[in-house]
Curated annotation (Swiss-Prot):
Gene Ontology terms, MF aspect: glycerol-1-phosphate dehydrogenase (NAD+) activity; glycerol-1-phosphate dehydrogenase (NADP+) activity; metal ion binding
Single GO BP term: glycerophospholipid metabolic process
Source organism (scientific name): Picrophilus torridus (strain ATCC 700027 / DSM 9790 / JCM 10055 / NBRC 100828 / KAW 2/3)
Pfam families the record matches: Fe-ADH_2 (PF13685)
Record flagged with keyword Lipid metabolism: yes
Residues annotated to bind Zn(2+): 171, 251, 267
One Gene Ontology cellular component: cytoplasm
Name of this protein: Glycerol-1-phosphate dehydrogenase [NAD(P)+]
Pathway: Membrane lipid metabolism; glycerophospholipid metabolism
Amino acid sequence: MNFNKIKSMHFPSDVYIGHDAILNIGSVVSKFLKSGEVLLITGENTYNIAGKKVLSNLNDFDVNVIIASRATRDSIKSIEESLKNRRSGIVLGVGGGSKIDIAKKIAYDLGIPFISVPTTPSHDGIASPRASIYDGKSVYSEEATMPSAIVADTSIMVLAPYRYVAAGAADVISNITAVLDWKLANRLKGEEFSSTAAVMSEYAGRELIERSSMIQPGLEESIWLVTKQILASGAAMAIAGSSRPASGSEHLFSHAIEILGPGSSIHGEQCAMGSLISMYLHGGDWELLKNTYRKIGLNTRAESYGIGREVAIKALSIAHRIRPSRYTILGESDLSYNVAERILSITGII
């Protein structure tokens, strides 16, 4: 039998994590920029928090700074239109999840390297080859450029509200249920499965559970701990060639919440709630997850984020519709109102 299988995997070749890591940004850019200018994508707040410091270390380069907003297809198209008469040679994403999603998607479209410079460890997108893009109706996980390098300065990231740290930890912990869903899809639907990616992704989540007592407000070592496991999660996705190792039914619930009305909740908080639902349905120890979230200071009650009871029930009922091709424990049919309400009540989400 002839073997003709081939798979391409891309990983960051340079990773700097720690205090004052941003001082290395100049040498990192020098390594990957072949020609043209540096395109620095950031937000209004993150420009003041980290963008200015990045610029001060890029005096030897021509830099085009773009202040971006939400990661939508329209905003990305608008930025790309503005670049038509410029020679962008590398993209730096400086900020939280949405700014990094915009940067990695533009880098993918332009076919140039991308460097991730996160200002908060709010979710695993800072180290993955996927971008969450909103099209006005729904959120889609799209193929994007894997970071060629990651520069995560813990002295900057620790300044972000602790809420984002806890949410980032929860996003990684929810990998555990994503892997359960992936195994289920492999068993019932014959979906391609990577044991290596699954083990790496689940390990990242369980490592944070075991060390959850170290995830505390104002502690730079907490940033270090969470960011390292975010990198492991990103590597798992690179191995799998998709977001499967880190995105299952918990993420479908999160996206449904975002569509129906997220209140004040952010991605990792939604995934935390979703992971309780998923683990309960899988017959696993959902109370361990709930206690871990409580330990790191993350609330899993929908009303605490302004998410109404009816919104939560509707979100769970329709979550499987968000990405029909991704089979999970939620199945392929809407849950009834009563069943969804019961699951949410048992897990304490409503």
